[in-house]
Amino acid sequence: MEEDKLLSAVPEEGDATRDPGPEPEEEPGVRNGMASEGLNSSLCSPGHERRGTPADTEEPTKDPDVAFHGLSLGLSLTNGLALGPDLNILEDSAESRPWRAGVLAEGDNASRSLYPDAEDPQLGLDGPGEPDVRDGFSATFEKILESELLRGTQYSSLDSLDGLSLTDESDSCVSFEAPLTPLIQQRARDSPEPGAGLGIGDMAFEGDMGAAGGDGELGSPLRRSISSSRSENVLSRLSLMAMPNGFHEDGPQGPGGDEDDDEEDTDKLLNSASDPSLKDGLSDSDSELSSSEGLEPGSADPLANGCQGVSEAAHRLARRLYHLEGFQRCDVARQLGKNNEFSRLVAGEYLSFFDFSGLTLDGALRTFLKAFPLMGETQERERVLTHFSRRYCQCNPDDSTSEDGIHTLTCALMLLNTDLHGHNIGKKMSCQQFIANLDQLNDGQDFAKDLLKTLYNSIKNEKLEWAIDEDELRKSLSELVDDKFGTGTKKVTRILDGGNPFLDVPQALSATTYKHGVLTRKTHADMDGKRTPRGRRGWKKFYAVLKGTILYLQKDEYRPDKALSEGDLKNAIRVHHALATRASDYSKKSNVLKLKTADWRVFLFQAPSKEEMLSWILRINLVAAIFSAPAFPAAVSSMKKFCRPLLPSCTTRLCQEEQLRSHENKLRQLTAELAEHRCHPVERGIKSKEAEEYRLKEHYLTFEKSRYETYIHLLAMKIKVGSDDLERIEARLATLEGDDPSLRKTHSSPALSQGHVTGSKTTKDATGPDT
């Protein structure tokens, strides 16, 4: 009560220019050991400055855009004394005991000490017309401080910065050493009191000027000497910017602004500063800000357009892919092969984990492929190899080969590996062919022949191997276990056949077995009817198994429970769109049948007996007639060169009746096309390229017409018999057509010799020079 009366009797500073408010002013003196000077100026909006003395009536001008970082926010003395608004030492009163260092935790009490506008005469704050109640020690301290200020030195209420490194922000004091510029020194000399007219805004502004390059003779410049203090970061950030939770908003306030609103905002602000969660958030945000504050003047922020954030995300993803953290090996190629900018960044970061320095190209490629299986579409794999080529050039800058040349060699090595070690029967690529295929592909120049020979021999002696995915390995092992115990119902493998090394069609190993027995094979022609070299024409005995649309040639006797070896898979032959006929023009051996495949390879097989030969011919042709899918239309082009259309290797989805109608339609189409082709013959005896193309097309149409005639005859017979028993079908054909049911001119064989069928003259062997 006595305190309220005393406050009401004391006039406040600036009553002459400000109307009294309806609400009583709270005591702004020292509470809980916290000085009242500093936070008022730092928390108010720009332009709202306190008046030091009645004599100092001129408001110091200040740029509102200037951000001040170093202020004396509150000076707490360990001996129980505090500095007043005029830098005077305040006496220790009973109300302020006990002194505590962490005044920010007491939000309500501390908020009342932030505004020194309402002076308390009992504390000796030099209100207008009030007696000075300071003791001799206070007066002596002020004289010492004034002499230090006039000499241009600096003063801090703390002897050291140890108090600012406390772990708890609420228990730490904040102090900043502001430089004393000539302007501030002049005001200090002209002012009757040492602290009068020393506006906080001016201190901040001049402090920034001093930090930017003031005269070093007048004191050391301000360089954020306490930037490591989290308490300073929190309070300075609170005073500089609006809070995201709405506690503080910057608004234009002049000297006559609403102080009640300021005091309420200050209470909220200080209470929020005492919240540990909020302080942590502010500290984190301030640490993020400090990283950008370290940039040189005029430098652009790297996070302005998000480039650095995207780059960091790409690096994190690449590191996880390389160390397989949350990813499998099969996921690597899928991530690196995408066609977008982020995937290219990820690929570049991923390749940075590899060091190809000093390695040969094939050695670097082997190292790279051991990290993950290179899977996906052709364009996806090509993108991955592009990133590999770029990284190889970065690690070997002294290599004279360009990046495009390295990429060309890399793709060539991949194709060479498939050609030399793939499951294809065709002729392997020679070293001379490998060199010829790369002519003038090194930016218009040729690669060094020694380099190409070295790469060829390396791939030939040791094939490229890449990592096996763990899931695929476990799946394969589980299939083997299921097969051993009879639990596996269906197994699938991939048979790589033909001249195209990228054509791999899954075939069910548990498909129906139509025939098996001993056959002796001779390769007569390779792909496209090219004559097989003499070194590979020899006869070899196999145990043949016709399972589904695949003719497996095994070295050992057939056993249903035995898995196929790699050599057995290499010798496998597809019989889709194939035609088996009796090789009547081959007189060196008896009981020989000829098999011509969809890619025009020709094989000769010798059976143990005539009956076995006829049975093999019937069953191969019947399987091809039932399961061969309809052919695609031929390509349309203005070129005169004839190209055979590709025949699908997949199984047809048509039923047998629909399949029969499809064959009949195709036969009519071929018959009409052959008739039209023969209407425009070329002169005989001409050996021009045009004549060769004419004869090749006629030979193709004749063979296709004979093949479909055979398919139609056998499929119609099967439908008529109404049974899947092949022995009954063979007996039916033997009854209708005599001893050689498969050699009727109009059905099975386009390769009949003259006089084989009595009373009829056959045409020349439709296979022409292939036999």
Curated annotation (Swiss-Prot):
Compartmental location: Cell membrane; Cell projection, Ruffle membrane; Cleavage furrow
Gene3D superfamilies (UniProt xref): Arf Nucleotide-binding Site Opener,domain 2, Pleckstrin-homology domain (PH domain)/Phosphotyrosine-binding domain (PTB)
Domain PH, residue spans: 512-625
Annotated membrane topology: Single-pass membrane protein
Transmembrane regions: 622-639
Coiled coil, from the record: 651-680
Alphabetic keyword roster: Cell membrane, Cell projection, Coiled coil, Membrane, Phosphoprotein, Transmembrane, Transmembrane helix
Family per record: Belongs to the PSD family.
Protein name: PH and SEC7 domain-containing protein 2
